Amino acid sequence: TAEIEALGSYVSSTYPPVTTTPLAYVPQAIGISLARLLGLNTVCLLYFGRFCNLLFFVAMLYWSMKRIPFGKEVLFGVAVLPMTLHLAASFSYDVMILACMFLLTAVCLDLAYEKAQVRVRDIVLLAVLAAVAGPCKMVYAPMLGLCLLIPMQKFGKVRNWFISAFAVGIAWGMAMYLVNSQVIATYAAATEADS
């Protein structure tokens, strides 16, 4: 970087920017669209987008707190941390990730410790949460390990457990690939060229 600064010129990268799923911006887009329909000014567009992001976060937090069998205080405590609140009332796509991870945690704990049986809609919900949050930040992938807390007996048959685990895993993997395939291909090609 010292060399670049000394030359005083800009350098362009051949690598594409890391992308994220457009779903992460839906709450903000709804707020902006609503403000535009009302004919409001630019500042109101900004605040409506942020407010809708906050409303989405609060709704998902409420759903998570209703679903989690224990630890409601801990979940709420994490949700009202200053940085979490700052993100919740911003345009950041981290709100979608946090909300999905809160709900994923709540659903996994509910299925592991409260519910007598795992239903198909529970697996679909876990797969959707994994697919939406997965491409945003790969660092949250270990959170899918919470699914392993759910006892096999609650699936009825071992075969159902394997199908469910495969469905959640493939939803996460396909979402990661579809959203980030261009970035992965570019970096893989660069690595091969460097070898």
Where do the language-model regions lie?
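Transmembrane-helix signature of polytopic, membrane-embedded enzymes
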Residues: L40-V43, Y62-P82
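Membrane-interface alpha helices of multi-pass inner-membrane proteins
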Residues: H86, D122-M138, M143-L149
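Short acidic/glycine- and proline-prone juxtamembrane loop motifs at membrane-interface regions
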Residues: S90-I97
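Membrane-interface transmembrane helices that cradle and orient dolichyl/undecaprenyl
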Residues: I68, L104-D122
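Interfacial juxtamembrane loops and adjacent helix segments
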Residues: T1-F48
